Amino acid sequence: MYKSVITEMKAHMEKSVEDLRKEYQRIRTGRASTSLLDEVKVDYYGNPSSLSQVATLAVPEPRTITITPWESKMIGPIEKAILNANLGLTPGNDGKLIRLNLPPLTEERRKEIVKGMKKMDEDHKVAVRNIRRKAIDDLKKMEKDKSITEDELKKAEKEVQTVTDSIIAKLDEILAHKEKEVMEV
């Protein structure tokens, strides 16, 4: 009976882990990655479209991203969209493709990025703890309604804590990996 509460809780917690991964993908490290441009929207005949829908993105060198528009007249709107996205990148074009050179990050900027990442990590941990609290409240309500016994409640609470601990360990692992990547010179 209580397994459904734990299954639902686990699904919500896993979503929180995935959200953190996605947020970290958008963080600029010393290495070029096309995921930096995931949120860039280009005005394509009046419709906001993602960059990958109007151009081919590639990483030919560790600090360079190239964007090859499928239509040459899209170079201007793509450059404008990149500048408006405030990524700290200046596009340069040769008429056929746009080149983004990522300058190396300063030590100070790296520390700022890590500080922001730690805040994101903490926000996700708070979300996980809130999910845990809701699950425990649901379990206590089930016990109060006599849907589960007191022994089942204790067993379920232990299981909830075990799942929560493993999810928080996952969040810490993701942070440690990304922090290492950012601090790498």
UniProtKB/Swiss-Prot annotation:
GO cellular component, as recorded: cytosol
Keyword Protein biosynthesis assigned: yes
Pfam families on file: RRF
InterPro entries: Ribosome_recyc_fac, Ribosome_recyc_fac_dom, RRF_sf
Main localisation: cytoplasm
Single Gene Ontology BP annotation: cytoplasmic translational termination
An annotated Gene Ontology molecular function: ribosomal large subunit binding
Cellular compartments annotated: Cytoplasm
Domain of life where this protein originates: Bacteria
Signal peptide: none
UniProt keywords, alphabetically: Cytoplasm, Protein biosynthesis
Biological role: Responsible for the release of ribosomes from messenger RNA at the termination of protein biosynthesis. May increase the efficiency of translation by recycling ribosomes from one round of translation to another.
Family assignment from sequence similarity: Belongs to the RRF family.
Xref: NCBIfam families: frr (TIGR00496)
Protein name: Ribosome-recycling factor
